[in-house]
Amino acid sequence: MYKPQQQQQLFDLQDNNGAAFDNGGTDPSCWLSHENEISRTDSSLSSSNVDPLLFNDLVQIVPLVQSLIDRKEKSSFTRRGSMTYTKMPSRESLYKKTSEVKGRNAGQSTATKKHRDQNKNVSSSQDGYAENFSTPSSTSSLTEKDREELMTLREKVEDLQKKLLEKDELLKEAEILKNEITATNAELDEMKKDISEKDFLVKTTQVQLSDALVKLADKKAAVEKLEWEAMTSSKKVERLQEDLDLLQGEISSFIQFVHALTGNDSRDSAEECNVIPYPWDQNVEIDKLNERDLQKMEAAREAYIAAVAAAKENPDEASLSAASTARSYLQSLVLRT
């Protein structure tokens, strides 16, 4: 609550401000001349039960009103504004208001910040503070020019707000575009990485394909060599077959010739048996010798046929050599006989 001394100081401060206003607001130091008194009043209020925020709000209103009156005079107002004082509030209302202000912790900081901003932007908050005081003479004396200026200012403010909103939208779009570009760059880097890996894989595959082609060429050459060897072996087998056929013909002819000789010898021996009583043993030895040679020749022929058959199935050097050896042995037997 207000003490009598504090109330008197507050009214003295208001009287001094009113006197400054009555002088037309031409003395810019009228407010500065009372700074010491305000500071003393503020220090005295801080030691009392009065809320200092409420008192500071009341004190800050005074220079705003003074600046409003100065502005109205400078805009070709010939009539000076006068300040109307309201009735001093009662103790109960002040106590109630003080209690409400103390209970609003968040509201106090917001109100303080708001009044500080209003001190910095006096021109934008003059109408709000002028409504708290009754200045009918100032508001009623607005000219058409001031209204036009006010409308122009409002239009400019609206245009500025629209431009600000447009810029905000542009900034948001730019931010979205920036994010999209960042995401696109990330995807591009990922694609480049994938392409590099695929290029490496393609190069590796090409190297492997080249090695496979070289191996295939080697195998093709080996196959051609085997085909040539097989063709050569086939030719050798054909020659051996021809020789075998020729030899078989010769052997057949020789066997027929031997059988013919054997038949003639048998007949001659039979005739001689009738005439000569003792040539039987010699003929028996000749027959035995002929049968032994025939058995050797038959065995050599069968061995040669088997060697030729083995050479046909597996035409290698060993089988061909065995067939040639069997043939030579058979020829030697035939020629020796």
Swiss-Prot record:
- Name the job this protein performs: Prevents homeodomain proteins (e.g. STM) association to plasmodesmata and, consequently, cell-to-cell transport. Binds to RNA. Alters KN1 RNA-binding capacity. Regulates cytoskeleton (e.g. actin) organization that determinates cell shape. Interferes with cell-to-cell transport of tobacco mosaic virus movement protein (TMV-MP) by mediating its accumulation at microtubules, thus interfering with cell-to-cell virus movement.
One Gene Ontology cellular component term attached to this UniProt record is: microtubule cytoskeleton
- Biological processes annotated in GO: defense response; negative regulation of protein transport; plasmodesmata-mediated intercellular transport; positive regulation of defense response to virus by host; regulation of cytoskeleton organization; transport of virus in host, cell to cell
MF (Gene Ontology):
microtubule binding; RNA binding
Assembly: Interacts with KN-1. Binds to tobacco mosaic virus movement protein (TMV-MP) at microtubules.
Name of the molecule in the record: Protein MICROTUBULE BINDING PROTEIN 2C
Tissue occurrence: Constitutively expressed in leaves.
Positions the record marks as coiled coil are 143-194, 223-250, 294-314
Instruction: Report biased composition (Basic and acidic residues) as residue ranges.
Output: 89-103
Q: Where is the composition biased (Polar residues)?
A: 120-142
- Please tell me the species this chain comes from: Nicotiana tabacum
